[in-house]
Amino acid sequence: EKKPGAPRTFQQDVSLHWRKRDWLLMLGVTLVYAVVALTNLGSMKAPQNPWVSSTRNEQVIIDLGEHHDDVTMLYFCQVSYSNFSVAVSEDGESWSDDYIADMAEGECFQWKYLTPSYMGKDKYGNDKRFFYSQPIKFSARYVRITSQQIGLKMNEAIFQDANGDRIPATVIAQLNVMEESTLYSDANNILDEQDTLEGLPSWWNSTYFDEIYHARTAYEPLHGTAPYETSHPPLGKVIMSLGIAIFGMVPFGWRVTGALAG
């Protein structure tokens, strides 16, 4: 018999006492979240094989097959640190003035149009090139791409006619190359994944907002390069790199782990 004032004793029970209904509710909520989060998360396609410039002034000449009017150019590049230029021609001999293509270091892993640009001053008074958003439309048969750096990594270029249809294109020359360089690559890589652009350039098929930092930083350790973004703790980017390792450097790949982690 328990004495008056004696402390009460309890048998510790650490089990959850979950019943079948509890498990079904949990799994149901998880399934609904997974469907909502993973549906339309991002494209499973993106160009993977780059042409890498082996010299500062390497050039690639592309033939569009015949004369076309109102041509627009899209391109998809990896991490690069300077712009490149594009010129057009009717005969492959006389070339237009160069258009400067935007490829600053934050413009990686996204589809971009070739657009007009102008030189101006930034907020600190330094010279800077500014780019408009409206695509350039040119009339020509031949296109010349010229790198402005060693190591420009262009995964793909697509040319569209006035109706937005892709123009079959062929690389006919690769000039100013250094074949003995470890960076040397076949310029045909620019045109070997034409089916990887789905729709128009958008969040669906490209990096956007902070992804230009975080997706890139998750990709870099997988390839033995120093991480670009170091202002945030690295664990999140390490988790992102798991998705990239499994699904590839595609929008779904760099977003899936964030979606699963909530």
Residue ranges of predicted features:
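Membrane-interfacial, low-structure loops and terminal tails that flank and connect transmembrane helices
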Residues: E1-K20, V52
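Surface-exposed intrinsically disordered loops and tails
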Residues: W111-N126
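Alpha-helical transmembrane segments
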Residues: D22-V36, A187-L191
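Extracytosolic helix-loop segments that constitute the early lumenal/periplasmic catalytic or substrate-binding loops
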Residues: H68, E179-V238, L242
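Lipid-exposed faces of alpha-helical membrane segments in multi-pass integral membrane proteins
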Residues: G28-V35, I239, T257-L260
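Loop-to-helix entry region of an early transmembrane alpha helix in multi-pass inner-membrane enzymes
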Residues: T230-V238, I246-G262
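Membrane-water interface of alpha-helical transmembrane segments
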Residues: L16-L27, P251, R255
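Aromatic, loop-rich ligand-recognition surfaces of beta-strand-rich domains
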Residues: L38-C108, Y124-W203
